Amino acid sequence: MKSYTIKFPHGIMFHHFHGKNHPIVQGSIGKETLSDIIEFIGIKNILNADEWAHKFQNHTLKSNQVCLTFDDALKSQVDIALPILRSHGLTGFFFIYSSIFEGVKEKLEVYRYFRTTQFSNIEDFYEYFFNYLKKFPVFDKIQNKLKNFNTAEYLKNCVFYSKSDKKFRYIRDQILTREEYFIIMDSIIEESKINLEKIYKKLWISEQDLKKINEENHILGLHSYSHPTNFATLSYKNQNEEYVKNKKHLEKITSEIFVMSHPSNSYNQDTLKILNNLKITMGFRADMNPIKSNLEIPRQDHSIITSML
């Protein structure tokens, strides 16, 4: 029987789940696959969040010990993943960005839902998006920047991304400004006539869900305030504001905020300095490069493990 090869301690990274009222979206898995992943890794190799954190901070983790992590405060994690964790007696780290709890409807998650539910497949969306760009003055800028774009080198640690995934993310994160991308996507969505209010209710967890996660002994951690996709490009002041506001919000639920994960795996030395100043002692990346510091712990994306099953 196949099993997961573990060479050093790391986290297992989850985002979207499907089932019940949650549709299949790009990268999502169902409850059966989550159970299969847990079995494949081996329950003996998965530590509860508090134990993994304690051993990490005391340098006593064994090479085969991993933890489970969940990013982005998604409702599907509560509805689909939490019952599976309960059935296995497991707890994990839940990394939360806070703006959604304070009245802000973060567009990036809405856009993600839209592109993976309103097209027959993700490649159809990419084809539509790339053609739609021709309507906007920024198209010439995009064409010029793409001349030197190397799909093999861009996001090369994210082996689960297709060439179209990488091209889309390069345009979104490296060529367009945040405002330009929003204008383009808002225009596409407006033409589609989709009901955004219904989407909002499906996407994110509530404050009550947050309290439940905390009460069930999972560990809450920082994930920035508004989840910028290119966090490293922010000024020191803006980065600091993102994490100070994020921490202030989560401290209403629990006073012990000591862990985080880097949104979109984007950070720099300013980020690490800010996190140290906020007394964050553990931080997770989104790739499997060897650990560089206590704020750069590797994580394996669940899609890599799913491909091994």
What are these regions (language model features)?
Residues 1-69, 75-76, 111, 215, ...:
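C-terminal active-site subregion of NodB/CE4 polysaccharide deacetylases
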Residues 9-20, 86-266, 297:
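Metal-dependent polysaccharide deacetylase catalytic core of the NodB/CE4 family, i.e.
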Residues 71, 85:
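Hydrophobic/aromatic pocket-lining and membrane-interface residues
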Residues 74-75, 226:
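Short active-site segment of divalent metal-dependent hydrolases/proteases
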Residues 77-81:
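Membrane-embedded segments
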Residues 83, 211, 272-273:
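Alpha-helical segments flanking ligand/cofactor-binding loops in enzyme cores
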